[in-house]
Amino acid sequence: MYKLDTDNKDHNSIIFWFKTWENKVQNKDYESAKILFENHVVSFGTWMNVVEGLEKLCANQWKSVWPTINNFKFLTDTLYIQISPDRLLANSIVIWDSTGCKKNGNSFKRNGRATVTLKRNNINDTWKCIHTHFSLNRGIPQKSYSSI
């Protein structure tokens, strides 16, 4: 029912949103990433418990994590998508992967899961994120120390 359907136009537009954000994370492109989000975004993260607002999300979550990881990737084939009947609100869950760096300089697999809520004003608009919740998988170190 909520599994990814690559024949669904809305699902494909959401895949595109995730791939676009993935590219911004990989390139540490904070300013371009902001375009994908509403200013009033509210989030949970691996670094922040609760963060309100895009500027705080960027300063306190993204800039604390992105410089310390590499190979960030949303595994979009794991996407589950719930779309409202009017097709203006979507809730997605997805698995993600990255490479972190231990204090001693050794790399480690840094993976987890995310819930992302997107909205748009009409079905021809691009999606904007209003909520994210990122969690590391069990047993994954909470901190990555430097870019690899």
Predicted segment positions?
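Short beta-strand edge/turn micro-motifs at domain boundaries
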Residues: 110-146
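Short, low-complexity N-terminal intrinsically disordered segments enriched in polar/charged residues
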Residues: 1-39, 145-148
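A solvent-exposed, acidic/Ser-Thr-rich amphipathic alpha-helical stretch
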Residues: 11-12, 30-88
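Hydrophobic/aromatic beta-strand elements that line small-molecule binding cavities or substrate pockets
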Residues: 21, 61-62, 76-82, 96-98, ...
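Short, cysteine-centered beta-strand-loop-beta hairpins and adjacent loop/turn segments enriched
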Residues: 69, 98-109
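A short, acidic/glycine-rich surface segment
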Residues: 2, 99-104, 139-141
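Residue-level preference for beta-strand/loop junctions
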Residues: 73, 88-92, 110-112
